[in-house]
A protein has these predicted regions:
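NTP/phosphate- and nucleic-acid-binding module
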Residues: 1-35, 39-41, 47-584
């Protein structure tokens, strides 16, 4: 979608349409008072206090009708400039405008407002010349929003809308908006029983339902086998640690605002972990290592907790409790290039399997003109940065350098993926760390018998299973590939009296092959059952009648297709096995 906020003409148009919305609301709800109505990437919104009245989605057409009536009158939009005193007098009975005016800088000599017909609002502008220009608009939705985004304040009603110069652009936007809604992983997650949330558990704490658990377990198995082939050793560690652990790692001093509050138990103070690296440092440090043992690769599917503002959490995409596909590689300096290349190759391998093509690599490097901001080892930095560049150039992946955006302790690689809708998201990361091994006094014995400090590569291929699941649900609109689908095959007997026995025998045979199969023997019409299987986006629906029973065959219909295919049971089993093996 076009970024309306960054388009000067569309920004002005949508800003004016926000005022048109407010004017229409004022006509229909005379007691309405208004907070702010800014332009955003997707259009505009206005926050409104209606007292005890509530605007619902079904009220939006009525408001649109009033907006069109006002626009047809063609009143000019006129700017007025006031002193602060004059502005306070003009809006004396509006507590929201009084609040805005009162907080304006005393040095601001001129306060502007705009008038269109019988409506005047405080605003910096700019606006279009007349309301007649506001022809092609649509109110999208209504939601709640706390005044000043503070949950201690009153809840206002927020109406979203969008405006374009012509009908074609508006219709294109609405189509894309419908596609975005259809791809929203929160809707898909609910429709397909992937996950849920509950206030008693808490915001940002998703509950994975049986179908979602299957998806997550398949993702875990998939990446586990890939990591195992590359020599990773997986561990389990507690999801809490002492405050002293995070003081040692530095997280307590530099990351505390993103952590949950600590809790005292007996004479110890614990905290939910925000990340797993401190635990993995201790595992590495548990034994003495020779240079010959390196690299040592420690992986974990670890539950972490990070504080997110309640207004920021979103389905599985942004959560407070997450499971990371985490690993830490302990390497010698001369192994950095080799291991970094292996990580990048693994990322590309995974993306190929999932059909991801629209992505770019972001290499965050230090600013050589501002060296005091970074860990003090010029040779280590120069060698590492050059080797990372060499790897990306050798593999031939698209990347850009972000100078000055490296962490204090080392350069970092982020993979930014463009989803089907919405802005780019970061899925995979690989961070070099020169400092953390020193904080934990980690070492290995080199070929001269001397202690040396290893370098650590923090890497996450999926990022978190939560965000990756959200991403894949939106990419596929919930039509997951066969190997990842919670239910792979749905069996429907035409008539239970004559075909249920054959269907049940087939069910057992397919389950013996470890396929995920359901049998729909409900007393419902055949067409209804088939449509429901399509709604659930089950890859294969088998319909079994006389012909199938008598000839030991099956007739299947693939999700999204109208045609059917008949084949022997053994042929079908072989076909399914081959499709699943492509990802194993």
């Amino acid at each position: 979608m076009i970024n309306i906020k960054e388009n000067e003409d569309l920004s002005r148009l949508n800003h004016s349409c926000a005022h048109l919305l407010a004017q229409a609301v004022k006509h229909l709800y005379p007691n309405a008072k208004f907070w702010v109505g800014p332009v955003i990437e997707d259009g505009f919104y206005y926050d409104i206090d209606l007292g005890d009245e509530v605007i619902k989605e079904e009220d939006l057409p009525k408001i649109e009708k009033e907006m069109k009536k006002i626009a047809k009158d063609g009143k000019r939009i006129v700017r007025h400039e006031l002193t602060k005193k004059e502005a306070l007098e003009m809006f004396h009975d509006d507590p929201y405008k009084i609040d805005l005016i009162s907080r304006m800088d005393e040095k601001e000599q001129v306060i502007s407002c705009y008038t269109q017909g019988d409506f005047t609002d405080l605003c910096r502008g700019p606006h279009v010349d007349t309301v007649k220009e506001l022809k092609y608009f649509k109110l999208i939705k209504v939601s709640g929003a706390y005044w000043k985004a503070d949950s201690n304040n009153k809840m206002l009603q927020r109406i979203y809308g969008v405006c374009f110069r012509n009908e074609e652009d508006l219709n294109d936007y609405i189509k894309e908006l419908e596609d975005r809604k259809a791809r929203d992983h929160r809707k898909i997650g609910k429709d397909l029983d992937i996950f849920m949330n509950h206030d008693l558990v808490g915001k940002g704490m998703p509950l994975w339902l049986p179908n979602g658990s299957i998806v997550r377990k398949e993702l875990e198995n998939y990446i586990y086998h890939k990591e195992q082939k590359l020599g990773y050793s997986h561990v389990y560690t507690p999801c809490v640690g002492t405050v002293d652990l995070y003081k040692t790692s530095g997280h307590w001093d530099h990351y505390k605002e993103n952590m949950f509050p600590s809790m005292k138990v007996d004479d110890e103070e614990f905290v939910l972990r925000p990340m797993n690296c401190p635990h993995h440092m201790l595992i590495y440090g548990n034994t003495i290592h020779s240079y010959r043992e390196l690299p040592i690769k420690i992986g974990e599917f670890a539950t972490d907790f990070r504080y997110e503002a309640s207004g920021a959490v979103k389905g599985l995409e942004r959560v407070r409790c997450m499971c990371r596909n985490d690993a830490h590689l302990f390497v010698r300096p001369d192994q950095i290039k080799q291991e970094f290349k292996e990580v990048v190759s693994l990322i590309l391998d995974v993306y190929k399997d999932f059909g991801l093509k629209n992505y770019t690599f972001r290499l965050s490097l230090r600013d050589p003109e501002d060296k005091h901001k970074y860990f003090d080892d010029d040779e280590m930095w120069n060698n590492a940065e050059n080797e990372l560049r060499e790897v990306l150039n050798e593999i031939g992946v698209p990347y850009h350098e972000a100078i000055g955006e490296a962490a204090f302790y080392g350069p970092k690689l982020d993979v930014e993926v463009k989803p089907a809708v919405g802005p780019e998201v970061t899925l995979s990361t690989c961070q070099l760390d020169f400092l953390l091994p020193r904080r934990f006094n980690l070492s290995y014995i080199d070929n001269n018998g001397e202690k040396k400090v290893p370098v650590v590569l923090h890497r996450a291929i999926f990022g978190t299973f939560d965000r990756f699941t959200a991403f894949i649900l939106e990419e596929t609109k919930g039509a997951l590939p066969l190997w990842l689908s919670p239910v792979q095959i749905n069996i429907i007997p035409v008539n239970n009296e004559y075909h249920l026995e054959y269907a049940t025998n087939l069910l057992n045979k397919l389950r013996d092959k470890e396929f995920r199969v359901e049998l729909d023997s409900r007393d419902e019409k055949m067409g209804y059952k088939i449509r429901e299987a399509q709604t659930k986006k089950i890859p294969y629906t088998l319909v079994l009648g006389n012909n199938e029973r008598d000839n030991n065959t099956i007739t299947y219909r693939k999700y999204g297709e109208e045609s059917t295919t008949t084949m022997s049971t053994e042929e079908f089993i072989t076909m399914i096995e081959e499709q699943i093996k492509e990802y194993k």
